[in-house]
């Protein structure tokens, strides 16, 4: 009896144990499946190589060139080498230089790999200062190449994204080459099939480093492979042409995520020159303040796109951020805060940095209108009222937007202050044949409150001529060859001599003033509000009233705008068009949006003014090839830390031709 009970108990214990073991096994199996499922969700198409390391999902694709288009196909590994998107794009179809060369280009289909440490410079010029400036430009060229490699290291591949490293300041960072970074990680140093890249830059003629609309910007570039060495030669007549050659060379180099090396063409030839002399971007730093670093970042993009004029709208009625040596009261009374100011050193630093990238800084102190905050201290200094209508309400009676403010045209101290500021700015930015006086949107009702003059427009004319005379005194008694003013009711008269003044036309492209200004003999710079104003289309920023301008100007709008063709200008009139400029007024833009509001739309203007491609196919439709090239250029901007706006879904960027 006791034996039977013992047996039953033993069987019960065994059964319980078996059930427990089966339960544990079943539960573990479920967990394993769940983990595998979750991992599959996280890495939907992950594979492993022979050593067991996971293969990134993007490397399961390769690209092949068919009918000048890169086609994405599955890559199964062992028999054929994977071709990355960027390497396919750079060797398939038309030349991938932005802006497109105007004269001659030839790129081989064969490419070579190398590391940034393999690149060396030799300068051939009779001018010592040009040699020094080219060495500076080349140093920054190498830093840009290192930045591209650094960006890839932190996780970007053939289609870049804005990484943590690229969002930080790029101008004083101690960046190491990517080959070194990868070597430290994997224990080996990557070596390309080139052992040396020798860059020779020859400046044949001018030793002048001063900016002028007469600068020779032409250049020739060639590369030739000799064994394991690549010979690069850039030939130009001036520093400015040579600098554009460096920008082109930078666009002939790319970073391949397959071997983590830089690549370029085995052989190439480019001969290039701009169609227009003035290729500008205007940034308003009064309505919002922008740091020196953000301005430099903008200039980097301009240099890569071969733009040559940074128009710095330094002050306006909203604020006066510039700290004048002679009249610091302007910033004390006019800046938003102590930290939101530009010192003399800041302006010099920006100008010197811009020259490295072939960009001239053109500062503008708008006058007599658009001058309010910062100008209210005159009576305390015994200088009388320097400005009128400052912050006056209702603002719509006395200015175009709040706050109001207009300089006093009958106070001699007003002109003395302007002369001193002009003198300072010319010292900071260097000798020039171009200066901007402002001069637009004067509200005559403001002055009418204070003066009984029957010809208030004549008072406006007198002010501009006085400002011109003071500029001449500030410039050692010589007026710059081109003194610019904004188009206005005043430029519709013959008050300002056409031999001295250039008009920046901001009104609509169909307005009669476009024709009248040319007929009256003025040189012009086009900045039409309906095409090249980049602040439009974001709605009204006031509680009442419509937006200042709408709709949004797409990069296609910017690109297709050819006013000289649509106006059917003859050769004489077209010669009066110095070029064009996109404008970024900053009522609704601060440093957080600057990059994506500017880029890549500004690049669209760059090609319009450098290349001026024809409208043979359609005046309104952008050719598909342009989409592909500007997409690649946009990616280059992102690699340099510029947060350029996306053009279309990433799928479309990786599959050219399927979306457009």
Swiss-Prot record:
- InterPro entries tied to this protein: Beta_hexosaminidase_sua/sub, Glyco_hydro_20_cat, Glycoside_hydrolase_SF, Hex-like_dom2, HEX_eukaryotic_N
The residues that the database entry marks as glycosylated are 210, 412, 452
Q: What are the UniProt keywords, alphabetically? A: Developmental protein, Glycoprotein, Glycosidase, Hydrolase, Signal
The record's CDD domains line, in alphabetical order, gives: GH20_HexA_HexB-like
Top-level division of the source organism's lineage: Eukaryota
Q: Could you tell me in which tissues this protein is expressed?
A: In third instar larval and early pupal brains, expressed in cells sending projections across the interhemispheric junction. In adult brain, expressed in mushroom body, ellipsoid body and pars intercerebralis.
| One Gene Ontology cellular component annotation held by this UniProt entry | plasma membrane
This entry's Gene Ontology molecular function terms read: beta-N-acetylglucosaminidase activity; beta-N-acetylhexosaminidase activity
What Enzyme Commission number(s) apply to this enzyme?
3.2.1.52
User: Which EC main class describes this enzyme?
Assistant: hydrolase
Catalysed reactions, as listed in the record: Hydrolysis of terminal non-reducing N-acetyl-D-hexosamine residues in N-acetyl-beta-D-hexosaminides
The answer to whether UniProt assigns keyword Secreted to this entry is: no
Q: Which family does it belong to?
A: Belongs to the glycosyl hydrolase 20 family.
Question: What name is this protein filed under?
Answer: Probable beta-hexosaminidase fdl
Q: What is the originating organism of this protein? A: Drosophila melanogaster
């Amino acid at each position: 009896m006791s034996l039977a009970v013992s047996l039953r108990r033993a069987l019960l214990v065994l059964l319980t144990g078996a059930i427990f073991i089966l339960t544990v096994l079943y539960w573990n199996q479920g967990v394993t499946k769940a983990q595998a499922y979750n991992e599959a969700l996280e890495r939907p198409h992950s594979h492993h190589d022979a050593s067991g390391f996971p293969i990134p999902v993007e490397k399961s694709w390769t690209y092949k060139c068919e009918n000048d288009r890169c086609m994405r196909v599955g890559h199964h590994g062992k028999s054929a080498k994977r071709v990355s998107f960027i390497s396919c794009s750079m060797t398939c179809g038309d030349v991938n230089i932005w802006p497109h060369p105007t004269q001659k280009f030839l790129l081989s289909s064969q490419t070579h790999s190398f590391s940034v440490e393999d690149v060396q410079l030799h300068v051939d010029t009779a001018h010592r200062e040009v040699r020094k400036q080219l060495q500076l430009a080349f140093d920054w060229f190498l830093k840009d190449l290192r930045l591209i490699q650094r960006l890839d290291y932190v996780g970007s591949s053939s289609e870049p994204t804005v990484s943590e490293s690229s969002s930080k300041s790029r101008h004083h960072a101690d960046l190491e080459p990517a080959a070194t970074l990868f070597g430290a990680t994997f224990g080996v140093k990557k070596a390309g099939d080139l052992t040396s890249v020798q860059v020779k830059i020859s400046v044949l003629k001018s030793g002048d480093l001063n900016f002028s609309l007469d600068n020779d910007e032409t250049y020739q570039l060639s590369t030739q492979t000799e064994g394991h060495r690549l010979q690069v030669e850039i030939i130009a007549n001036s520093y400015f042409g040579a600098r554009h050659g460096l920008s082109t060379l930078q666009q002939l180099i790319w970073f391949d995520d397959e071997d983590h090396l830089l690549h370029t063409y085995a052989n190439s030839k480019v001969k290039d020159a701009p169609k227009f002399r003035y290729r500008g971007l205007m940034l308003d730093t009064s309505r919002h303040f922008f740091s020196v670093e953000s301005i430099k970042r903008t200039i980097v993009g301009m240099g890569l796109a071969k733009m040559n004029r940074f128009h710095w709208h330094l002050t306006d009625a909203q604020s006066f951020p510039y700290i004048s040596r002679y009249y610091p009261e302007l910033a004390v009374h006019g800046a938003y805060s102590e930290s939101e100011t530009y010192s003399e050193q800041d302006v010099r630093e920006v100008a010197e940095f811009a020259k490295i990238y072939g960009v001239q800084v053109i500062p503008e102190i708008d006058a007599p209108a658009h001058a309010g905050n910062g100008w209210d201290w005159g009576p305390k200094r015994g200088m009388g009222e320097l400005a009128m209508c400052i912050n006056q309400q209702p603002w719509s009676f006395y200015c175009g937007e709040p706050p109001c403010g207009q300089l006093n045209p009958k106070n001699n101290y007003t002109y003395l202050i302007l002369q001193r500021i002009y003198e300072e700015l010319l010292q900071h930015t260097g000798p020039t044949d171009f200066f901007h006086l402002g001069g637009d949107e004067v509200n005559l009702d403001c002055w009418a409150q204070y003066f009984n003059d029957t010809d208030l427009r004549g008072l406006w004319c007198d002010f501009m001529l006085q400002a011109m005379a003071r500029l001449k005194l500030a410039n050692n008694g010589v007026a710059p060859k081109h003194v610019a003013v904004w188009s206005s009711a005043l430029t519709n008269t013959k008050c300002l001599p056409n031999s001295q003044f250039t008009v920046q036309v901001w009104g609509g492209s169909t307005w009669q003033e476009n024709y009248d200004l040319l007929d009256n003999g003025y040189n012009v710079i086009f900045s039409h509000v309906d095409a090249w104003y980049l602040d439009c289309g974001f709605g009204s920023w006031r509680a009442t009233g419509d937006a200042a301008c709408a709709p949004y100007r797409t990069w296609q709008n910017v690109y297709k705008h050819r006013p000289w063709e649509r106006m059917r200008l003859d050769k004489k009139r077209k010669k009066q068009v110095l070029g064009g400029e996109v404008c970024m007024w900053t009522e609704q833009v601060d440093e957080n949006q600057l990059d994506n509001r500017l880029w890549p739309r500004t690049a669209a203007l760059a090609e319009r003014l450098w290349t001026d491609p024809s409208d043979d196919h359609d005046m309104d439709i952008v050719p598909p090839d342009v989409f592909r090239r500007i997409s690649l250029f946009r990616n280059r901007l992102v690699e340099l830390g510029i947060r350029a706006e996306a053009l279309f879904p990433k799928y479309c960027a990786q599959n050219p031709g399927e979306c457009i």
